[in-house]
Amino acid sequence: YFSLNLASQGLIRNLTATDISPGMLKSLKSTAKDLGIKVRTVVTDAENLPFPDESFDVVLGHAVLHHIPDLDKAFSEFFRVLKPGGMIVFCGEPSRYGDRLAAVPKRTGLFVAPAWRRLVGADALTHTAEEMADDEHSLEPEVDVHAFVPADLRAIPPRSGFEHTRVRGEELVANVWGWGMRSMESSATPDSIPWRWRNFAYKSYLGFQKVDNHLLEPYLPAELFYNLLLSAQKPE
């Protein structure tokens, strides 16, 4: 969880977590308890926040905005509950081009998965018809409402009064590599995937992240990347 990671590093002192799903918040609260982090959880949608005006210093989220139907209404709520000078920070939002690009390694990974399983000695994962029907990925077209063009995403916060809006891209090579790895691994039973492979996949992903961070993200336009990061400030 994005907020718990920040809180564990001492970057958040008073944490309030919201979600439309009670089950998700229950899971978050359990994890927070294990980490020794105090958190208040509130079931709500982003377009109708049940908080007084000027309640928070920061409103943040990871992979949240593309699930919200009415973004203008949500950003008006973010603006309302922020104190003057407060910030919004959203990470992990899919770009339209990056989302299309990710489909290539996803398909490729599934295509080469049988050969990969033989190579690493992993067992094929089989699903019952009931499991296939309940697969959470089948819900993606229903819950993934937006894939963003950076210019369009950048235009949303100012309509609610925000200033200093910034959008940048994150992950290009790491995205292609990571989705390929995840697609292959999703075809195998988790316990049968060798530790050496897991270690290789993780470290190679981190290596490609460094390539993105140092060589690509500073120079290429945001729309080429898989993830978009948005920040803006409420006037003081």
Q: What do the predicted segments below correspond to?
A:
Residues 1-48:
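Class I SAM-dependent methyltransferase SAM/SAH-binding core
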Residues 47-58:
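A short acidic, Gly/Pro-enriched loop at the edge of an enzyme's catalytic core
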Residues 58-70:
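A short SAM/SAH-binding and catalytic strip from SAM-dependent methyltransferases
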Residues 72-87:
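A short glycine-rich, Lys/Arg-flanked "PGG" loop and its adjoining helix->strand segment in the class I
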Residues 87-128:
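Conserved class I S-adenosyl-L-methionine
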Residues 136-152:
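Acceptor-substrate binding/catalytic loop of class I
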Residues 150, 162-173:
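Conserved S-adenosyl-L-methionine
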Residues 160-161, 171, 180-194, 201-236:
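C-terminal lobe and adjacent flexible extensions of AdoMet/dcAdoMet transferase-like proteins
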